[in-house]
Amino acid sequence: MKNVLSIQSHVIYGHAGNSAAVFPMQRLGVNVWPLNTVQLSNHMQYGHWAGSAIDAAKMEQLVDGIAAIGALKRCDAVLSGFLGSPAQARAAVEIVRTVKATNPNAWYFCDPAMGQTGGIRPEPGVEEFIVAELPELADGMAPNHSELQKLAGQRIETVAEAVAACRSIIRRGPQVILVKHLHDRNSPADRFNMLVVTETEAWIGQRPLYAFPRHPVGVGDLTSAIFVARRLRGDSVRAAFEHTLAAVHAVVKATYDARRYELELVAAQDEIARPSEWFGAWVTGAD
């Protein structure tokens, strides 16, 4: 069974960061080692919260502890999400390097959280660090639209521009870019676009966009987690993308139908593993 070290935020109540990522990956048959960068009572969009960030040095100490018992060599991938400070970002880089030195076959998938995540905003300097340092280290990245623009240093309004932006990042290091939410001026307003790009291929997929009175937090974290899990299970990029598109839609639809604010991960767990409604991806002709 594959193992992934997931370095993200955590909420006790609700689903964001590791609280949105761990269970879906486990449900898909992947062991998860959660390392929580932030521990909060709930995500901050409720208006009240309690909690704090972990010290960056302790992040490395925890991973050193795994290495000390001889288990780190079994880590097949590292997934990083919210990093609250430049010190945490640097610690994540050192952790990835340690994992890869221990297991050269391990890969790193970066969800480059640069904006407000569950109401949490990273400290100044995190965005600049991610843009400057992480593409060279990552084997894959999962930006949303605004994060893609920051990584590529350009405005993006069409699929063609998004593919070109992804390819510019791929030239820096990653093998695959998953765009978790793509705004395309040519797409219908009621559709949610996702895109995945490699050096030679690109696929786009669409699912329905639901008009939530308050949009649930953690959808992006869920998206990255499912894609990583399916890739670890051996799916091709396209197959992992299509499974992710379908499974995330199922969770979002279950949440919308239940009129909930928090993602209905447990209720929709069978759909995460075996989605009943699929949305085929198609190759884009964008160069």
Swiss-Prot record:
Substrates-to-products reaction catalysed: pyridoxal + ATP = pyridoxal 5'-phosphate + ADP + H(+)
Enzyme class per UniProt: transferase
GO CC terms: cytosol
Binding-site positions, ATP: D111, A142, E147, K180
Keyword terms, alphabetized: ATP-binding, Kinase, Magnesium, Nucleotide-binding, Transferase
GO BP field: pyridoxal 5'-phosphate salvage
Disulfide pairings: none
One Pfam family recorded for the sequence: Phos_pyr_kin
MF (Gene Ontology): ATP binding; magnesium ion binding; pyridoxal kinase activity
Gene3D superfamilies in UniProt: 3.40.1190.20
Cofactor: Mg(2+)
Matches recorded under SUPFAM superfamilies: Ribokinase-like
EC number of this enzyme: 2.7.1.35
Pathway field: Cofactor metabolism; pyridoxal 5'-phosphate salvage; pyridoxal 5'-phosphate from pyridoxal: step 1/1
InterPro entries: PM/HMP-P_kinase-1 (IPR013749), PyrdxlKinase (IPR004625), Pyridoxal_kinase_PdxY (IPR023685), Ribokinase-like (IPR029056)
Role according to the record: Pyridoxal kinase involved in the salvage pathway of pyridoxal 5'-phosphate (PLP). Catalyzes the phosphorylation of pyridoxal to PLP.
Known partners and oligomeric status: Homodimer.
Record protein name field: Pyridoxal kinase PdxY
